From Swiss-Prot:
Transmembrane segments: none annotated. The active site is at 86 (proton donor/acceptor), 120 (acyl-thioester intermediate), 261 (proton donor/acceptor). (3S)-3-hydroxy-3-methylglutaryl-CoA binds at residues 120, 211, 261, 270, 338, 372. This is Hydroxymethylglutaryl-CoA synthase. PROSITE patterns: HMG_COA_SYNTHASE. It comes from Mycosarcoma maydis (Corn smut fungus). PANTHER family: 3-HYDROXY-3-METHYLGLUTARYL COENZYME A SYNTHASE, HYDROXYMETHYLGLUTARYL-COA SYNTHASE. It catalyses: acetoacetyl-CoA + acetyl-CoA + H2O = (3S)-3-hydroxy-3-methylglutaryl-CoA + CoA + H(+). One of its GO terms (biological process) is farnesyl diphosphate biosynthetic process, mevalonate pathway. Belongs to the thiolase-like superfamily. HMG-CoA synthase family.
Length: 462
């Protein structure tokens, strides 16, 4: 009997985002709001934007083809393909089935996996499915691909500045340089903070204050669950340790970097401060918290989610740690905005692109995945091999710098076009192909039966 696969994780990664973006600073002027509302209040600099030439299928085709081609992956070596998205354009047909066109020329149609959906969490559900498949008795020796991607757009109003777009594809298999640790902590519950009940529109229903509280409240619960599980694994299963001591035994200091689902930068910073608060709450008498008011330990934990004094105290307490543990993963969100299911993994691409391979060896990364409604998980990655090829293939910094900043009016007009043509039949998109990257897929036509066909920009185009 062959040995079970070891060191299962990410072997290669690719990211795709639109070629164009708008400036959040210019958007403040365009919307007539106070200066700093978007750039300081949300912590955002730019937001990726696209028009009717791109949809979730074209995003997925672009990112998976890029993963295969840049890393010389044989399509026949893939045995599973999972997709996570909340950008739904068909209530029955999955994005995964469209992606099978990339594998048909090789004759490989024996690929398991399908789409997962729950707001921004679907990519993580897809990832866990792929990891579990590789580690299971069903594994056939081939690698898996996980795709996470979305087009995040909002109706005119206060939420529009926290949109964005992008997708990430990950090659999952054994003997990987980025290894997933076995402990997961998950919290799921029923909330109505963000949802999309109107299938005739791409826009969600959003309760802004509620979604912030849900994000942070689920972080508390997922972090608790993660620490309990990680402590048990660390000690060799349950051995009489209390939950309280288990919670205190796992802390942010155990990790070199932290990554969060990233709707916008300011919420990520709140999330990091919340982790530090949870460490304090589990071990308030530790001398390292001497600068924190002692009475914070006696406050009801749930009530502190909206307590500005607590938030400010831990923002100040964690200011230095934030620069080293959090900041390296922020490039993508600041340039592309919210990528929904892909945002956490866009942060991972940023982190890898900012830290040299030799410096990141042996380091641990704590990840927080969240999707409204709500689903949340905490898990960890350990770096166990060279990341040089991953960084070289992705070429993130050059690609982010090459994005074209367009006027805000262009973005508004693109959204109006999408509104007018959403669910349209006998529709040929009007977006200009020169606005797309070389090698990108695009929507070519929607026929009288809603069937979509796609084209591709030549890879050698300017």
């Amino acid at each position: 009997m062959s040995a079970r696969p070891q060191n299962v994780g990410i072997k290669a990664i690719e990211i795709y985002f639109p070629r164009r973006c708008i400036s959040e600073d210019e958007l403040e002027d365009f919307d007539g709001v106070a200066k700093g509302k978007y750039t300081i209040g949300f912590g955002q600099k730019y937001m990726a934007c696209t028009d009717d030439r791109e949809d979730i299928n074209s995003f997925a085709l672009s990112v998976v083809s890029g993963l295969l081609e840049k890393n010389n992956i044989d399509p026949r070596s893939i045995g599973r393909l999972d997709v996570g998205t909340e950008t739904i354009i068909d209530k029955s047909k999955s994005v995964k089935t469209v992606l099978m066109d990339l594998f048909a020329p090789s004759g490989n149609m024996n690929i398991e996996g399908i789409d997962s959906k729950n707001a921004c969490y679907g990519g993580t559900a897809a990832l866990f499915n792929a990891i579990n498949w590789v580690e299971s008795s069903s594994w056939d020796g081939r690698d898996a691909i996980v795709v996470a991607g979305d087009i995040a757009i909002y109706a005119e109003g206060s939420a529009r500045p926290v949109g964005g777009a992008g997708s990430v594809a990950m090659l999952i298999g054994p003997d990987a340089p980025l290894v997933f640790e076995p402990a997961h902590g998950t919290h799921m519950s029923n909330y109505w903070d963000f949802y999309k009940p109107n299938l005739s529109s791409e826009y969600p229903e959003v309760d802004g204050p509620e979604t912030i509280q849900t994000y942070l409240g689920c972080l508390d619960k997922a972090y608790d669950a993660y620490r309990l599980r990680a402590a048990k694994l660390k000690s060799g299963a349950a051995n009489g340790h209390s939950d309280a001591s288990s919670l205190a035994s796992i802390k942010v200091d155990d990790f070199d970097y932290t990554l969060f689902h990233s709707p916008y930068s300011k919420l990520v910073q709140k999330g990091f401060g919340r982790l530090l608060y949870n460490d304090f709450f589990s071990d308030p008498k530790n001398e390292k918290y001497a600068s924190i008011p002692a009475n914070f330990a006696e406050l009801d934990r749930k009530s502190t989610i909206t307590n500005k004094d607590v938030e400010k105290a831990f923002a100040a307490f964690g200011k230095e740690a934030q620069q080293t543990k959090l900041e390296p993963g922020m490039n993508t969100v600041r340039r592309c905005g919210n990528m929904y299911t892909a945002s956490l993994y866009g942060g991972l691409v940023s982190l890898l692109s900012n830290i040299p391979s030799q410096e990141i060896q042996g380091k641990r990364i704590l990840l927080y995945s969240f999707g409204s409604g709500a689903a949340a998980s905490m898990f960890a990655i350990r770096i166990n091999g060279s990341t040089e090829q991953i960084v070289k293939a992705v070429d993130l910094k050059n690609r982010l710098d090459s994005m074209k900043v367009v006027p805000c009016q262009t973005y508004v007009e693109a959204l109006k076009t999408r509104e007018a043509t959403h669910n349209a039949v006998n529709h040929k998109p009007v977006g200009q192909l020169e606005n797309l990257w070389p090698g990108a897929y695009y929507l070519e036509n929607v026929d009288h039966m809603y069937r979509r066909t796609y084209g591709r920009i030549p890879t050698n185009a300017n």
